[in-house]
Regions:
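Generic structural signal for small/hydrophobic residues in well-ordered secondary structure
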Residues: 31, 35-36, 53, 112, ...
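Short, intrinsically disordered, charge-biased short linear motifs at domain edges
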Residues: 20-30, 255-261, 311-321
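Flexible mid-to-C-terminal extensions adjoining Fe-S/redox cofactors in radical SAM and related proteins
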Residues: 269, 284-366
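Conserved alpha-helical substructure of the radical SAM core
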Residues: 2-127, 220-224, 343, 366
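Alpha-helical membrane-targeting segments
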Residues: 1-24, 240-264, 336-366
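Radical SAM enzyme [4Fe-4S]-AdoMet core and its adjacent flexible, acidic
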Residues: 123-284, 288, 292-302, 343
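Secreted/processed peptides and extracellular or luminal domains of membrane proteins
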Residues: 41, 45-48, 278, 296, ...
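Short cysteine clusters
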Residues: 35, 39-42, 77, 272, ...
Length: 366
């Protein structure tokens, strides 16, 4: 993260004035809409498109070059792509991301474990983060995810991944907080934490164009969400973290405060850099600023897989305009973390909180 600080001013200028022209540092690639779950908070599996082939991904990654710092592979269920290992290999060889993040529902345990091990081996200079999606405990999780036995399969996958002994592999658990589980969140957190994941993260269920959930009542009330997040933050504050984990948790606490503020005030609390520093490629090659709006900046197929041809196009500028003018707001975690990195105020607050925590720990030991 430290190496990103010198680029802050450049990205602020890109957002405000359109120059210098910069590539995204945070890129999400949705490799498929197909999914073997039927979640109550997501309808993405209903979308039918002609997915990018491995060759098309390779051409796109070649055109991107080594600009991407954080690469997220999402779906649908990414591990329904039998060529997921080759997609990751191409991304690593062409883009050299420092972080490759993959989300999974954990259903295809053996294939996921085998694939992740190969991805880790093929990407020695990248940190590989695999997050298992777990929204409830036992049969309640199966009900939310629409698959009988999903909970047991997810835990089997978690244990298998956790047994892999690689220094560049992090295995976490991710919970979507929705109206279907918010009342039970403290128990969910305590139970899942027993498995000692490398990280535990949450995100609020949202109406997203990408997920086909516009107009659906899936989110908890603001009061319910705030109560759940306040509980989580207290638990995080009472745990001791060192090194990079301390920095990560400090940013996470800051994000949860930011998410609450955005939902309360219904505005961009921090300037949003979606479409500037972060972007998403859909399974059919459309480039979006973000998955909430899912407005196409252009079609990579029609652009000959030339990322910059789409990214610096007039259509891309038109998609960025309402974001720059703060005509939208959301607590989308992926975009929010990069927004926080572009805010000197937020960075100062994070460092202040880390220092205060260190002083408190020192005084407690004394």
């Amino acid at each position: 993260m430290i190496q990103l600080i010198p680029k802050i001013t450049a990205y602020q200028m890109f957002r405000q004035f359109g120059f210098p022209r910069l590539y995204p540092l945070n890129l999400t690639v949705s490799v498929t809409y197909r999914c073997n779950a039927r979640c109550r908070t997501c309808n993405v599996y209903q979308k039918k498109v002609r997915e990018f082939s491995l060759e098309e991904f390779e051409k796109t990654f070649e055109s991107l070059g080594s600009h991407v710092f954080w690469l997220t592979l999402s779906g649908g269920e990414p591990f329904l792509r039998k060529d997921i290992v080759d997609i990751c290999r191409s991304a690593y060889q062409n883009c050299r991301p420092k972080i490759i993040n993959i989300a999974t529902n954990g259903i295809l345990s053996d294939f996921i474990t085998e694939s992740v091990e190969r991805i880790v081996q093929n990407s020695p200079k990248s940190l590989i983060i695999v997050n298992l999606s777990v929204d409830e405990i036992g049969e309640k999780h199966d009900d939310i995810r629409g698959v009988k036995g999903n909970y047991k399969k997810a835990l089997k996958t978690f244990r298998a991944l956790n047994s892999l002994n690689y220094s560049n592999l992090t295995v976490g658990i991710h919970t979507v907080i929705s109206r279907f589980n918010v009342h039970n969140f403290p128990r969910i957190f305590e139970e899942l934490n027993r498995f000692q994941p490398d990280s535990y993260i949450t995100e609020i269920a949202e109406q997203r164009v990408e997920l086909g959930t516009m107009g659906e009542e899936i989110a908890p009330s603001l009061q319910e969400y705030v109560k759940a997040i306040d509980f989580l933050c207290e638990r995080i504050k009472h745990r001791r973290y060192n090194g990079i984990s301390a920095l990560t948790q400090a940013f996470r606490l800051q994000y949860y405060d930011l998410a609450k503020e955005i939902l309360k005030e219904k505005r961009q609390v921090l300037p949003c850099y979606a479409g500037f520093i972060s972007a998403q490629i859909a399974p059919d090659g459309q480039i979006w600023a973000c998955c909430i709006r899912a407005e196409s900046m252009g079609d990579l197929r029609k652009a000959g897989y030339d990322f910059k041809r789409v990214w610096f196009s007039e259509k891309a500028q038109a998609v960025r305009k309402p974001i720059r003018e703060k005509k939208c707001f959301c607590p989308l975690a992926n975009a929010s973390y990069t927004n926080m990195l572009l805010s000197f105020r937020t960075l100062a607050s994070v460092l202040k909180n880390i220092a205060a925590r260190r002083v408190k720990e020192h005084m407690t030991r004394a």
